[in-house]
Swiss-Prot record:
Single annotated GO MF: carbon-carbon lyase activity
Positions contributing to Zn(2+) binding: H440, H504
UniProt binding sites for [4Fe-4S] cluster: C584, C587, C592
Entry-linked InterPro entries: ThiC, ThiC-associated_dom, ThiC/Bza_core_dom, ThiC/BzaA/B
EC numbers on record: 4.1.99.17
The entry's keywords: 4Fe-4S, Iron, Iron-sulfur, Lyase, Metal-binding, S-adenosyl-L-methionine, Thiamine biosynthesis, Zinc
Cofactor(s), names only, from the UniProt record: [4Fe-4S] cluster
Organism classification: Bacteria, Pseudomonadati, Pseudomonadota, Betaproteobacteria, Burkholderiales
Sections of the chain in a coiled coil: none
GO biological process: thiamine biosynthetic process; thiamine diphosphate biosynthetic process
Source species of the chain: Bordetella pertussis (strain Tohama I / ATCC BAA-589 / NCTC 13251)
Stated name of the protein: Phosphomethylpyrimidine synthase
Amino acid sequence: MNANPTFLAATAEVDAAAVAPLPKSRKVYETGSRPDIRVPFREIEQADTPTMFGGEKNPPLTVYDTSGPYTDPQASIDIRRGLPALRRAWIEERGDTEVLDGPTSDYGKERLTDPKLTAMRFDLQRPPRRARAGANVTQMHYARRGIVTPEMEFIALRENLRREHYLETLRASGPDGEKLAKRLLRQHPGQSFGAALPSAITPEFVREEVARGRAIIPANINHPEIEPMIIGRNFLVKINANIGNSAVSSGIGEEVEKMTWAIRWGGDTVMDLSTGKHIHETREWIIRNSPVPIGTVPIYQALEKVDGKAEELTWEIFRDTLIEQAEQGVDYFTIHAGVRLPFIPMTADRMTGIVSRGGSIMAKWCLAHHKESFLYERFEEICEIMKAYDVSFSLGDGLRPGSGYDANDEAQFAELKTLGELTQVAWKHDVQVMIEGPGHVPMQMIKENMELQLKHCDEAPFYTLGPLTTDIAPGYDHITSGIGAALIGWYGTAMLCYVTPKEHLGLPNKKDVKDGIITYKIAAHAADLAKGHPGAAIRDNALSKARFEFRWDDQFNLGLDPDTAKEFHDETLPKDSMKVAHFCSMCGPHFCSMKITQDVRDYAAAQGVSEKDALQQGMQEKAVEFVKKGAEVYHRT
């Protein structure tokens, strides 16, 4: 697809690379209590264990799937029409919303009637909705009234990953099925740092966590296309992928491609951080084609409306922007309401000052007017807008540290306390909240961030950017931050915002997006393992079994990135025959540790002794052989 002005709605096409199923994978669905609750998963086919290793069946493995209909061969994908409105019936039957005649924001009306935008505009036939007068349509409001919504049931099924089904298929796989099931479901005890991880997620548990404020379901009533998901420390750790154009790079087509690419590899949510041309139109195309929640930073677009002059921002412009984006279907807003006038001087001695774009915008406004932030002063009015559309807060950390030097300083924690106070205000309105966190933090200082967030914000979900654990690796900050992300995820962070290799350097392309996502999927999964999340080790165990049995294709396919794993293997062992070889190019055929281990097991079986006895017996035989050959360390050839 081409960029900015040349993007044409009539010829828009889905990215072919995003729609093909992953190798040996198929889309499967689990139906809930009603036929329109169909929860998607990816099922990975496995080969049978080779006869020499026991010849047992290896049933398909179910994994979490964020790719939506794009990887379902039965789905008809046309990005000009958008995705099906999965939640429409659920929203309508609640009877607490009204259909509007059209956009009610001034800017939304302006864009809709601008003839110059016709060729690039998404042709949405469905008008927006909002809450009826006096109604509250948030998932938190329903949860606090004791209502288990279809979204909550959908999430419960999704979080359980069909573990019971997998257990049953293992048990039915053969005469040793029970033994195999016990082996593959084995998991080391975790350290959850106070998180309450039930053995199975129920719809009622989802409701309780949302009612308590410990979890959020980002699900704007104007984004019926999403497949519901949850963010909370008692659930699987999630990751977010940032996309978005700039004034000098990328356009609508590229950003839609990045979104479909991001969800293919595991992005649980996507933030559109566009700051260039056609922000409104870009966002519409992304939302209409996204099965995952979309977040934004509304102050970015508000700033564009005043030609980049922060001091000219007004509450009226910002309010109109909130309504504009809420009526498009944005699921969560990053709002930097904790950047207060008294906190700005606290950043004076920092090495890197205020590095958050949103934070710096509001700091400049506060200083220009020498007034308290209108985001802080008008926070209750913002809550009224949020609950009319069920937009969740992502309370921004505008004073986050931009270097390890500035980590855990007075400004950062003053803002965090304020975010905790604002959380209580939002909860008074039954508006869902998560809290954004740093940033750049050395490893030994990360745990304090989590502990203080839990204390000040009353266990509202934490959503962190990394944190980056060192500042010496431009070009590799997906790694410096992945280390911190794994740690803070273990300590209790609910969602990790990915960092790409281009962080601090430039706008990420599709490859950067994938690299960032895979890095953060690793971090999130490592955190789930460390917390002891039920069933977290199943995929690890299945892949380890495949590795030991030299099922190369299964190793590739069970991994997070089958394409890259296969590519690396094929660089040195490209032939199909090498896919059944009992070695890889690292050690070769004579030094493969797993092959040697298997040889020991075969020897033990042949001798009718234990592996331990086989090792001892084998060493004795080799000792005798050594003496018979003259007891020489080296022999002439």
